[in-house]
């Protein structure tokens, strides 16, 4: 594949190689896809009323923890999950940092962050009025992860996280979040059987330290 790319694009030799995506899942497994996110992904929508929720406000001193029911089957999330949150502003802005984890093992799976003023996406801030309700259309960073059968997922909603700065004016006050069916987590799922030809193994380079003299 790499030689074909080199010959066609750099030496103008041969036919144009097929463009494929090589994606590594969080457990180390590799799979080939024509596009990524995969075109055949099916969306699983979960209202937050289906989660066990602790907390109702996100600020510098309060957070919300959500835990799903157990997944009966192994579940492969491949793409950009979305989290649409119904919130009540308590200030003229504010932000939410959402972290997704495997609730059974504590393994971090991904995150997303959004400023309430950019609740519909894009680059233009919108006016936010205290005590009015809005929908934050959050999107997680790209994820290709597996949830083993019998595990559940957790969503932690905090005011900030990683290397993000707190909201400059509204962090202490925060905002209220409806953990009801009005707030929805959507997961892009794909099904790849163990014998699917799109799975492949990467040959690891030999360790020079173990090479015979």
Task: Show the residue positions of the predicted features.
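Glycine/threonine-rich phosphate-binding loop and adjacent beta-strand/alpha-helix elements that clamp
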Residues: 7-213
């Amino acid at each position: 594949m790499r030689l074909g790319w080199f010959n066609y694009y750099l030496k103008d030799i041969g036919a144009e190689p097929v463009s494929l995506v090589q994606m590594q899942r969080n457990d180390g497994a590799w799979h080939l896809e024509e596009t990524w996110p995969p075109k055949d992904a099916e969306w699983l929508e979960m209202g937050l009323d289906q989660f066990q929720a602790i907390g109702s406000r996100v600020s510098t001193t309060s957070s919300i923890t959500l835990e799903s029911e157990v997944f009966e089957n192994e579940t492969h999330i491949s793409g950009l999950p979305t989290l649409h949150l119904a919130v009540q502003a308590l200030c003229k802005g504010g932000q939410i940092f959402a972290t997704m984890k495997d609730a059974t093992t504590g393994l971090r799976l991904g995150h997303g962050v959004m400023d309430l003023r950019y609740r519909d996406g894009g680059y233009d801030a919108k006016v936010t009025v205290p005590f009015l309700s809005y929908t934050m259309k959050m999107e997680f960073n790209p994820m290709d992860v597996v949830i083993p059968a019998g595990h559940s997922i957790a969503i932690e909603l905090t005011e900030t996280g990683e290397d993000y700065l707190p909201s400059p004016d509204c962090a202490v006050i925060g905002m209220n979040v409806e953990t009801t069916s009005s707030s929805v987590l959507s997961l892009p799922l794909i099904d790849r059987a163990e014998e699917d030809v799109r799975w492949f193994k990467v040959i690891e380079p030999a360790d020079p330290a173990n090479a015979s003299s």
